[in-house]
Amino acid sequence: MDINTLLNTPDEDVLSLFTPQVARWFKEKYKVFTPPQKGAIPLIKKGKNVLVSSPTGSGKTLAAFLGILDTLIDLGYKNELNKQIYAIYISPLRALNNDMRRNLIEPLTELRNLYPDLPEISIGVRTSDTSSYEKQKMLKKPPHILITTPESFGISLVSPKFREKLSDVKWVIVDEIHELANSKRGAYLAGLLELYKSFIAKNNFVRIGLSATISPLEEVAKFLVGGNGDYEIIDARFVKPTDIQVVSPVKDLVHATEEEVNIGIYSYLVDEIKKHKTTLIFTNTRHAAERVAYKLRKMFEDQNIFDSDLVAAHHSSLSRDVRLEVEEKLKRGELKVVVSSTSLELGIDIGYIDLVTLLSSPKSVSRLLQRVGRAGHHIREVSKGRVVVVDRDDLVECTVLAKLAIDRKIDNIHVPENPLDVLTQLIVAASLITPIEKDKLYEIIKNVYNFRSLSYDEYNNVAEYLAGNYGLDSNKVYAKIRIKDGMISPKRGTRMIFFLNSGTIPDEAMIPVKMENGGYVGNLEEEFVEILAPGDIFVLAGKTYEFIRSEGNSVIVKKSEGQRPTVPSWFSEMLPLAFDSAIEIGKFRGKIAEAIMNEVPKDEVISSIMSEYNLSRFAALSIYNYVKEELLFTGGIVPTDKLLLIEVYDDDDQNRNFIFHGLYGRRTVDALSRAIAYIISKDLNMDVRIAITDNGFAITVPGKQEYEISKVFDKLEPDKMYEILSDVILRTEMIKRRFRHCAERSFMLLKRYKGRETSIDRRQINSEVLLGVVRQIEHFPVLKETVREILEDYMDIKRAIEIVEKIRNGDIKVATIGPNQVPSPFAHNILVKQYTDVVLAEDKRELLKELHNKVIEFLRNKGIDIDLEYTEAGIK
């Protein structure tokens, strides 16, 4: 149902569906329905499956629950309200569950104040935080509405006594479905809902999905209902007015020092904070969130602006108690500014925010809209967002993302396909609900959207593994099910294993870093360790170290004083640029380049950028200069969505760098770069280095090796890429960590067993032993899944193959320049990413400035007279 239909639906049509009591309460409290409510309530009342997509503050929750509450109240007045669970609300966040309980109790309390004889509607929360006593109480007196998480829902289904209480549920609500659909956690929940429908539910229940702005809605709806389920979509994604602007903190992004940029950023932030009641600032890393909060507190104190206690940080590394305290203070209006990484993107109720500021690119349109949507917590209030950029690439990227957001063009989500570790848990869960025919269970699993293309061989391999038919008993991997006469049933002890080990979220480990001689240095996050390769140099506690190897759950390093870091310490936290957005950035570059090449007057181009993209003159001028410099440097070539530029650059360290300017998003670039590096490494018979960014990648070869780089795509056959990359990643740190995660999800490694918890250190050591064993087993499902997860979920091999096919058939042209002793302007950030760390931000800006000066000198040496103004004042 589109937005115009929703807006034109008379309120009286919806009110007429309610009992007089609920109709009166609604009219007195809210007066009018929001578009999502106008669309969803009548459909839910009719028993239709519904996906509601709309921004924060548009009344989604009430749209889902009001019809349900009204039906329960009506049943109560008719003395037909039984002691049973009628509705299940499933949310990915426990904090959302507590919010939801409060949000449901409030209207019921207000209704009871109006009508003292209102039937009692009970609400219960069942998560890992719920005490055994509370769970026992639920068995005796189940709540009418059950609030839970995917993991606790799974445990409920295999609990013999409690699942009886779930047999007559009428509605299942999945909140924040956009957060679930693109993860294994979502695949797990989708599978659990299918098992619930097939084995426990007496009747067809209504599925209601609540989502922030997401695309494509059809795919998310299919994920919600599974199989051949019918559904209706309420598309109210763009119902709230949105005001998004990109801001440059300095007039000249090229020549400003790091100090000038920082002064510009914080001056801007303080000015905006003063003008608004509550400001929410998003950074892209937890480290940056802490840094910005600290700096603002200090400025508030030193300049006597506000009390420094009015500033708080909120991110996932903080304790739950600290996060809850910040959320409560926000709701009560006791904070002036909160700085967050990603933790406040989801729909936790955080009260009134009138400005959202993003420091640097959010990397996708949907994330931009989600973050900005936190401002103006009512449907008629403007969601006001400002994006502060730090360099020219950031400016170009954010300019395009902001325009796409205003034009309502959203990136498509990625839904994991056939995650075999999740399948393992679903087969075990099914066996614990009831003994089942193996072939019948396959048909049920195929109804789950994530498993629609699952082959019988893949399914059978997982079942055989669970039945202990791979001979892993000597490695203490025992059967969890038995298969006899085509029937699957659980082995003794399997129920307890499921209770203690089910779920898909891996334990996050801090990895100890040790010197070769055994001295302790500090800790690194596991995500960071998995991207390291021998020889990588990184910063820890302000000093540089070279990665040698990992041993079990430790990292072995040696000092590398004076050497530049090759991997930024925040790299693993960085959000990847979405593929669809990357393609649009390529188109934007091409559009500006074409105008310049066609000799459209400079002022006309700049005015056009200003008006079409809502930019200041400084920002538009900066983009114009950036593209023009690249054109002058390359002799008229700018990398776009239709042209891949390969630049050969010989650096001062006698290395040859092959720089691939390909805007395809980080996940695609990651896969593409490793495949190309494999070809070059094989041809030259030497190790090469890779540096990956959102705007392309650099492959560095020691010594100025001659290599015909333009022919590399002739050697890279698309149908061999999966095989090549599988082979490549089997030699990385990543495979060790990811295999442990998949082995834990597959019950190969047990986190908890017989009342004992196994440490992550011990599990990592055990997993590496198991990895060595299963590498010898053909088509072993847990290893196959580890490779699939890395290539399809972490990277995007499908898009990488698509790009190679387009290059080989001529849809994407390839141009080559060099070798040069100076890198082109567009190459600077790709190269600088190799050499910079957060502690060296000043060095990064100096290096960029130095590279820019070399470009100007390079052009003048070629007889090209550069005359570009860099600020409105006309600095030449």
UniProtKB/Swiss-Prot annotation:
The keyword ATP-binding applies. Keywords: ATP-binding, DNA damage, DNA repair, DNA-binding, Helicase, Hydrolase, Isomerase, Nucleotide-binding. It holds the Pfam family Helicase_C. SUPFAM superfamilies: P-loop containing nucleoside triphosphate hydrolases (SSF52540). Disruption phenotype: No visible growth phenotype, signficantly reduced survival after UV treatment. No change in sensitivity to methanesulfonate or hydroxyurea. Slightly further reduced survival in a double deletion with upsE (an ATPase implicated in mating). Coiled coil: none annotated. GO terms for molecular function: ATP binding; ATP hydrolysis activity; catalytic activity, acting on DNA; DNA binding; helicase activity. CDD domains: DEXHc_LHR-like, SF2_C_LHR. Residues 422-506 are annotated as: WH domain. It comes from the Archaea. Residues 507-876 are annotated as: Domain 4. Residues 249-421 form the Helicase C-terminal domain. Residues 41-232 form the Helicase ATP-binding domain. Probably part of a 4-gene DNA damage response locus in which the upstream ups system, in combination with this downstream locus, functions in homologous recombination to rescue Sulfolobales from DNA-damaging threats. DNA helicase that translocates in a 3'-5' direction on single-stranded (ss)DNA. Binds Holliday junction (HJ) DNA, Y-shaped DNA, DNA with a 3'-overhang and single-stranded (ss)DNA with high affinity; binds double-stranded (ds)DNA with less affinity. Has helicase activity on DNA with a 3'-overhang, Y-shaped DNA and HJ DNA. Does not unwind blunt-ended dsDNA or DNA with a 5'-overhang. PANTHER family: ATP-DEPENDENT HELICASE LHR-RELATED-RELATED, LARGE HELICASE-RELATED PROTEIN. Monomer. This is ATP-dependent helicase Lhr-Core. It comes from Sulfolobus acidocaldarius (strain ATCC 33909 / DSM 639 / JCM 8929 / NBRC 15157 / NCIMB 11770).
